[in-house]
């Protein structure tokens, strides 16, 4: 469309108002604005007028759609249509502004390119809302209505002015100010938990964030490291912390993408077993991969499939993990290839699994005398090992103790691969010249130090008239009894894989040395299948198994004199063997001092208190005199009643006697002074008010009451205490009634029941009544009871 300004009916006017023109001027709003012309929407009437940009009095760059203008109306000379001339921009009126608080409902899209870039003034809009008098109102806004260089997001809290377009009547928001950004919810994984707080590994950046347990919205008992959570980040004291922590379904947060394809590479740097103080790299390991361009991938201690020790030069297979947050690549799911031992410089050894414990075990080595410790985590290929399995392994020093070795990288071998030695089928006879000892008896933990090195024993034997000697080890002895000096044994001779070495194996005891010394002792303790013997010096006890007793075990009683020999079993522990009953200790030949002393037990026998180290008990004289405070030992022989259980603190009377081969003065004929009252009597048993150990009542059976007396509650009694060796519980025996207790008097009816009976009103119609629905009858359908009811005395059975 062409336009000629000279065609306007302006009567020679220059087109610009000088303030003296009397022409009628109107107002309107720029509705459309193009490069050289535009259109105005009139405010006072429904009309849309064309105008040429040359008719605008001012900088055209400041004119935009929506601006208020003042103009005159003229007509196009050629077409006769009304047009606007002499345009002047009207300054906006200043109205009192009321600012409203609200929030963004729909944000203006960011980086949205206009489909018609040639059309200025057309920009995308968003919407906000506010509340007034319980109603919610929605307004539109554009990015130009936002103050400052701020990009609003949905949910942001804002403050704005309501603008009412007087020309179009449209209401919008302008002068928008951001009050508070919406708190974004982040996701992560709980990576550490302390006493009252923890840390979350964030899913958006490679960073950990602190959280306090009070911020967890849920059951804290169920929260554990590895759980997926979402949270809000807040700033407290200048530090970011996680708040409003909530659980997410497992698997929601994914940090990395793991390749499906497997790769192979070579370990160039291993993770140190003991990290240095300056070690800050969380992925210290390195694996070289032969891609088109060779590269090294890092890995950490959690990236291996198992805990098997990696060595430099190992050939491994792995996946590549790519972190979504920073795109860092690392090797993961690392497993050692079976052919890796061809490329490493390690010395491999062989052996057989000798023992298995909880999480660790021991290997009997082919080339070493000592058993080699190993941990289950060092087993390759996830195999489960059993005792006698043949294995191959590498020996390395322990990181915590250089003097101790252990086996790593254990590989299971086929049966028949390992051979310790070749031995002849011929059996030899010999005599033990030196006993063999173990190194560490009953080793259950690899952290226990060696108490004593193992020592080989020596066997003297005759081979074709030539007297020879050969070494043997305690582990090669068959049976539970170790041979002692002078014992006859049978054995085989084996050649170890290490050349030039012979050793006796499969050593079996044939007979004890007939000249072995026989000792006397006294039965001190009897358990289910073993017991202890008090030595002739009465200062210690010796273990013996019932299988070593010649005779009926049931005939053994505490205090019986026995004869025995000493033997060393596995673990260098001394025990009694070939136990024979001699004669009763009651016929003791030593003469006791006739003086009777009063004393107090200050230490019981070890059989009563197994926690104490010393076997002997101790009694202190408490009666006035020159000997008050003197202490004398005692054993099972010194007890008047061998089954009596003397406890610490009990009062006793005793005599003194010189006993034992070392002529020691000891307490003898010890009798406890116990007196207490009967707590209660049941049918066939009762309880005495006497404290024994943790129990404040002492049990007794009625058959233990002497002279057939029927005890009543409150009776004062004397008694002995015996210890059940099988159950470890004490009970009373030999119960004598010293004096009767007070007779039980029937207690009167309590006042509360008497008062209640007095207050019952039988005539009250509202009172609860008891109605008989069915009369009682006996089994034969008769009424009443055949036997007369009698008053029964408590504790007496008819």
From Swiss-Prot:
Superkingdom: Eukaryota
Keyword Cytoplasm found: yes
Domain SUZ-C: 748-789
InterPro entries: CSD, CSD_CS, CSDE1, CSP_DNA-bd, NA-bd_OB-fold, SUZ-C
Pfam families in the record: CSD (PF00313), CSDE1 (PF23456), SUZ-C (PF12901)
Glycyl lysine isopeptide (Lys-Gly) (interchain with G-Cter in SUMO2) crosslink residues: 91
GO cellular component, one term: CRD-mediated mRNA stability complex
Modification N6-acetyllysine, positions: 81
A GO MF label: lncRNA binding
GO biological process, one term: negative regulation of nuclear-transcribed mRNA catabolic process, deadenylation-dependent decay
Annotated CSD domain residues: 26-87, 136-179, 186-245, 297-337, 349-410, 447-507, 519-579, 610-670, 674-735
Modified residues (Phosphoserine): 123, 276, 514, 584
Entry keyword set: Acetylation, Cytoplasm, Isopeptide bond, Phosphoprotein, Repeat, RNA-binding, Ubl conjugation
Regions crossing the membrane: none
Summary of subunit composition and partner proteins: Component of a multi subunit autoregulatory ribonucleoprotein complex (ARC), at least composed of IGF2BP1, PABPC1 and CSDE1. Interacts with STRAP. Part of a complex associated with the FOS mCRD domain and consisting of PABPC1, PAIP1, HNRPD and SYNCRIP. The interaction with PABPC1 is direct and RNA-independent. Interacts with EIF4ENIF1/4E-T.
Similarity field: Belongs to the UNR family.
Function in brief: RNA-binding protein involved in translationally coupled mRNA turnover. Implicated with other RNA-binding proteins in the cytoplasmic deadenylation/translational and decay interplay of the FOS mRNA mediated by the major coding-region determinant of instability (mCRD) domain. Required for efficient formation of stress granules.
Name of the protein described by the UniProt record: Cold shock domain-containing protein E1
Organism: Mus musculus (Mouse)
């Amino acid at each position: 469309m062409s336009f000629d300004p000279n065609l306007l009916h302006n009567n020679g006017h220059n087109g610009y108002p000088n303030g003296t023109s009397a022409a009628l001027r109107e107002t309107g709003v720029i509705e459309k604005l193009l490069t050289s012309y535009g259109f105005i929407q009139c405010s006072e009437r429904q009309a849309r007028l064309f105008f040429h940009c040359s008719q605008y009095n001012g900088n055209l760059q400041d004119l935009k759609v929506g601006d208020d203008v003042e103009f005159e109306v003229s007509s196009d000379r050629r077409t006769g249509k009304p047009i606007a001339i002499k345009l002047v921009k009207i300054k906006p009126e200043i109205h009192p502004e009321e600012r409203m608080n609200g929030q963004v409902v729909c944000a203006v899209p960011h980086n949205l390119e206009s489909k018609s870039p040639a059309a200025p003034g057309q920009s995308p809009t968003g919407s906000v809302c506010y509340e007034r008098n319980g109603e919610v109102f929605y307004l539109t806004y554009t990015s130009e209505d936002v103050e400052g260089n701020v990009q609003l997001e949905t949910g942001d809290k804002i403050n704005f002015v309501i603008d009412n377009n007087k020309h179009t009547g449209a209401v919008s928001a302008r002068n928008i100010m951001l009050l508070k950004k919406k708190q974004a919810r982040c996701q992560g994984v709980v990576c550490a938990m302390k006493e009252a707080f923890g840390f979350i590994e964030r899913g958006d950046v490679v960073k950990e964030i602190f959280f306090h347990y009070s911020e967890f919205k849920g059951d804290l008992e169920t929260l554990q490291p590895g759980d997926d959570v979402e949270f809000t980040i807040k700033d407290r004291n200048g530090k970011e912390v996680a708040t409003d922590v909530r659980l997410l379904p497992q698997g929601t947060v994914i940090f990395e993408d793991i390749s499906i394809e497997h790769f192979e590479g070579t370990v160039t740097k291993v993770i140190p077993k003991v990290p240095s103080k300056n070690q800050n790299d969380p992925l210290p390991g390195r694996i070289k991969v032969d891609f088109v361009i060779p590269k090294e991938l890092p890995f950490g201690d959690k990236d291996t499939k198992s805990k098997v020790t990696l060595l430099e030069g190992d050939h491994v297979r792995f996946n590549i993990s790519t972190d979504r947050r920073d795109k860092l690549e690392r090797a993961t799911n690392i497993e050692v290839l079976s052919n890796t031992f061809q490329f490493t410089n390690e010395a491999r050894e062989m052996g057989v699994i000798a023992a298995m414990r909880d999480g660790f075990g021991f290997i009997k080595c082919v080339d070493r005398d000592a058993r080699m410790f190993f941990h289950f985590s060092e087993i390759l290929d996830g195999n489960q090992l059993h005792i006698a399995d043949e294995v191959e392994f590498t020996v390395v020093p322990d990181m915590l103790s250089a003097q101790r070795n252990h086996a790593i990288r254990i590989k299971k071998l086929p049966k028949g691969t390992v051979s310790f030695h070749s031995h002849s089928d011929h059996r030899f006879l010999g005599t033990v010249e030196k006993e063999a000892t173990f190194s560490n008896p009953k080793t259950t933990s690899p952290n226990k130090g060696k108490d004593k090195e193992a020592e080989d024993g020596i066997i003297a034997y005759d081979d074709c008239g030539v007297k020879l000697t050969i070494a043997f080890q305690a582990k090669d002895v068959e049976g539970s009894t170790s041979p002692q000096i002078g014992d006859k044994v049978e054995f085989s001779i084996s050649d170890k894989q290490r050349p030039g070495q012979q050793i006796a194996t499969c050593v079996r005891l044939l007979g004890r040395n007939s000249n072995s010394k026989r000792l006397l002792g006294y039965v001190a303790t009897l358990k289910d299948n073993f017991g202890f013997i008090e030595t002739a010096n009465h200062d210690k006890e010796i273990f013996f198994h019932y299988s070593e007793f010649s005779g009926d075990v049931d005939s053994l009683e505490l205090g019986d004199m026995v004869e025995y020999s000493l033997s060393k079993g596995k673990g260098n522990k001394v025990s009694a063997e070939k136990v024979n009953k001699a004669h009763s200790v009651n016929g003791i030949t030593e003469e006791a001092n006739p003086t009777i002393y009063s004393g107090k037990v200050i230490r019981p026998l070890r059989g009563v208190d197994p926690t104490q180290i010393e076997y002997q008990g101790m009694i202190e004289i408490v009666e006035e005199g020159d000997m008050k405070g003197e202490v004398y030992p005692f054993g099972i022989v010194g007890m008047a009643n061998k089954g009596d259980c003397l406890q610490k603190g009990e009062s006793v009377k005793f005599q003194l006697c010189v006993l034992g081969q070392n002529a020691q003065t000891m307490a003898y004929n010890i009798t406890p002074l116990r007196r207490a009252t009967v707590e209660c009597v049941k049918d066939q048993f009762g309880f005495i008010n006497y404290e024994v150990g943790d129990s404040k009542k002492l049990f007794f059976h009625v058959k233990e009451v002497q002279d057939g007396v029927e005890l009543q509650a409150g009776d004062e009694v004397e008694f002995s205490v015996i210890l059940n060796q099988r159950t470890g519980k004490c009970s009373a025996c030999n119960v004598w009634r010293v004096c009767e207790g007070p007779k039980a008097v029937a207690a009167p009816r309590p006042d509360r029941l008497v008062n209640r009976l007095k207050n019952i009103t039988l005539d009250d119609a509202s009172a609860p009544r008891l109605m008989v629905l069915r009369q009682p009858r006996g089994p034969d359908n008769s009424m009443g009871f055949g036997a007369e009811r009698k008053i029964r005395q408590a504790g007496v059975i008819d």
